[in-house]
Amino acid sequence: MASVSIDHGTAIFRLPDGTREERPITPEYPVEKALEDFLGRFHVEGEYANYCGLYGYTSFNAVRYFENIPVKDSREATNDAPDMLYILYQYLIVFNDFKNEMVLLEMLAPGEESELDTVQKAINNRNYTAYDFRAVGETTSPLTDEQHKVNIRQGIAHCLRGDVFQIVLSRRFEQRFVGDDFKLYRALRSINPSPYLFYFDFGGFRIFGSSPETHCRIEGRHAYIDPIAGTTKRTGDPEQDALNAQYLHDDPKENAEHVMLVDLARNDLSRNCHDVKVDFYKEMQYYSHVIHLVSRVSGTLNEDARPIKAFIDTFPAGTLSGAPKVRAMQLISELEPHNRGAYGGCIGFIGLNGSLNQAITIRTFVSRNGVLWFQAGGGIVAKSNEEYELQEVNNKLGALKKAIVMAEKM
């Protein structure tokens, strides 16, 4: 129906009447103003109006619009994904698992005729071709294990020098494939059920995953961040998992890292909120291949605070960058040999009513031209161990690699 994208310093509006508008992003016209201008073009009424809004993503690279971070820019023929892309869909299917019901929604301008019957027939039509999924060749990475350990050692050195207290360094992997990547998404959500399950088909590329972490959620005038900081391997053996969880809970390094990132979340919310508090602290959450240490920070938006600005002021998550955040991101740009793209950004919903729900883009595949990109990282502090940090990346990728194997058998 309509979309807004931010790419190479330009805001692009595509409107329902087919028109296209472009405007440069400047200090006088920042990203939040562009998003608010676009949202202001639409007003929706009706019983299910709260579900209507923008669905899409903000890439990690979008930080260039919010802070002084020298993100490597590129214009590649094989990669036309914008830094931010949010779409207003005319039709939505809302699943209510509590009531076991499905609602088909349609947004209509005054005077427009409904096409709900046509859409419903298309949904019920099962006459489509199904394709298998098959991985081709071996998984590769721009970084070898040793090169990633060199980066980890450099991160530790920056912590020891006092440049940062923590820095999150990641490693990207690539896997060629043929067939239907939706089967891979089905496998992933089966292996690693998470609070955020998503599959976005943007035409030339797809982003899909099973993220455990809330980047920012706004309901009414209340904002929430759920920082995950602290990870250990899950074995499937209840006794061993209990020992691993206890080790994670008691480990001084993991606890120091967690406290630091909870404080960073509090600071991020405090830029636009008052009554900022910790709702729960160091809760163990179990996933298919890892155990996470999780807290929740919340606050009430100030009277003059705008939801979009509050969201942007939390970006990117401290758990995917480090602390102090700006210096950590500058070092990430120097140390990592590639743009992060979608990884470490966020994906989700921006409501027309001011609500917002964004997941951090982790445990996620980006699929384009028969290649899967996936990535994971870990928080590096002065007391980090390079072998442990290397293994943490492998642990976090466990569900994704297992999903590739399962998808081939579906």
For every predicted segment, state its role.
Residues 1-410:
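Extended alpha-helical targeting/anchoring segments
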